[in-house]
Amino acid sequence: MFEKLFSPIKIRGMELKNRVMLPAMGTKFSGKASYVTDQLIDYHVARVKGGCGLNMVEVCSVHTPSAPRGFLSISEDEYVPGLKKLTDAIHAEGGKAGIQLSQGSMAVGMDQTAQILMASDMPMEIGRASCRERV
């Protein structure tokens, strides 16, 4: 059933060592400043060593003020060296890296520090507590 899972695959010139993919997540290992940290690098390197052929690196904000705290950013050139260091570490272990770009918007939820950007004004209700009858 899984004969091809651990076999290499070529996608438009990029060869993956297998078909195992780590989806993008928000580990919040980048801390409040949204930069790549050693903890984040270690996390992704461990996933490659564990067998992932492709790591989708985090939820990465294209507009830092609208991102939840602790999420990576790629909104300014100053973030690029850290992202390159992370990518190089993944490549050094034989993995490949991709990235999930995010603008934040309503996904920032209740993060009071985020400056939510949206395409247009949208009225929204503040949430309310749930009760046993609703659940």
What are these regions (language model features)?
Residues 56-80, 101-114:
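Glycine-rich, proline-tolerant flexible connector loops at the mouths of alpha/beta enzymes
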Residues 96, 102-132:
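Non-globular sequence segments
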Residues 41-63:
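Catalytic domains of carbohydrate-active enzymes, especially glycoside hydrolases
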Residues 22, 47, 51, 90, ...:
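Conserved, mostly hydrophobic/aromatic
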Residues 25-39, 69-76, 110, 126-132:
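Active-site mouth loops of central-metabolism enzymes
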